[in-house]
Amino acid sequence: MEVVNALGRRKRAIARVFVSEGTGKITINKRDLAEYFPSTILQYVVKQPLNKLGVAEKYDIKVNLCGGGFTGQSQALRLAIARALVKINAEDKPALRSEGFMTRDPRSVERKKPGQPKARRRFQFSKR
């Protein structure tokens, strides 16, 4: 099997994934998964598509992650891994879609408007 690549985005985070056959090692920006994401919850989020299909020990994953925060990066990585797994085997797509791993979350930060301190907040109104 050749190297399969995919892209995942969430908020400002971008994850570029390169999947090849191996032993289940996930390397993010030349660091181990547990070193990059110390939180077990974020590690679980990243591994969700692999665990759903039962292929966690079958592929080595190299990741280039940039932008955003920890949560956004982990969810961008989850989407990228799911897309790469579908490129490898298209029959897995319905199983991943039913769990919501194939859907790009469109929510992002709303822009600040002029004449207001924040996106929705207005300056205090004084009647007199």
Curated annotation (Swiss-Prot):
Q: Which cellular component terms (GO) are annotated to the entry?
A: cytosolic small ribosomal subunit
User: Which HAMAP family does the UniProt record give?
Assistant: Ribosomal_uS9_B
Q: Which UniProt keywords apply?
A: Ribonucleoprotein, Ribosomal protein
Family label: Belongs to the universal ribosomal protein uS9 family.
Q: What is this protein called?
A: Small ribosomal subunit protein uS9
Q: List, as start-end ranges, the regions of compositional bias called Basic residues.
A: 114-128
Which InterPro entries is this protein grouped with?
A: Ribosomal_Su5_D2-typ_SF (IPR020568), Ribosomal_uS9 (IPR000754), Ribosomal_uS9_bac/plastid (IPR023035), Ribosomal_uS9_CS (IPR020574), Ribsml_uS5_D2-typ_fold_subgr (IPR014721)
Q: Where is the composition biased (Basic and acidic residues)?
A: 97-113
Q: Which Gene Ontology molecular function entries are recorded, alphabetically?
A: RNA binding; structural constituent of ribosome
Q: Where is this region: Disordered?
A: 97-128
Provide the disulphide bond pattern. Answer: none
GO biological-process terms attached to the record:
translation
